[in-house]
Amino acid sequence: MKTMQIKDLFQVTSGNKLDFGKMATTENGVAFVSRSSRNNGVVGYIEKIGNVSPFESGLITVSLGGTYVLSSFVQPTEFYTAQNVAVLRPLVEMSIQEKLFYCMCISANRFRYSAFGREANRTLKYLEVPTREEIPEWVSSATIPDYSHIKKVTHSANSILIQFLMGSLGFVSYLILNTLNLWCTRIQRLKKVV
């Protein structure tokens, strides 16, 4: 399999390095991405900061340290980041399926790091991932359904769906489901604002 380094596919930047505890939170604000491995790394929503532009939607965030080092997510809305979160901007246009595939590839390198030991801040851009030509065909043919019409997925229904997907389709489906659930939540919040 042909591989290349992350830096040859993405522009790697260090994010905003903000402290969530010092931000003014609001339910309908800008997503705040930390090193969390849950909810696409989003720990809350904050008011826009006048002199700091949020990152645009569609970029990948990567946790550079902590227990879930290299947790990687495609952000469906604009966002700010905490410390130790990298932001990856594709150097060429990529589909959401390709971005999710690279999130999976990045996260799969977690074993190279230890929580609160070796962190990824210096080495992320040198991680080897498959070239775009090596992406399996099923990735580009995967359909990501539009769940924006669903108001709320109950916890039990969500758990059953996750169990089914984990057993039948594997980890990539889980990543896609996580992203879709987050997008649905954010779309509903945006509808409330408008």
Locate predicted features.
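A short beta-sheet element
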Residues: 44-105
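Non-catalytic DNA-recognition/assembly elements of restriction-modification systems
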Residues: 1-19, 23-39, 132-194
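A short glycine-rich beta-alpha junction/loop motif
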Residues: 79-86, 116-138
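Structural beta-strand/beta-sheet cores of well-ordered domains, especially the beta-sheet scaffolds
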Residues: 16, 28-33, 58-60, 84, ...
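Intrinsically disordered, charged low-complexity linkers and terminal tails
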Residues: 82, 90-92, 96, 129, ...
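Short, recurring structural edge motifs at helix starts
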Residues: 18-22, 113-116, 128-129
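A common structural junction motif
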Residues: 108-111
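A generic structural motif
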Residues: 114-120, 150-154
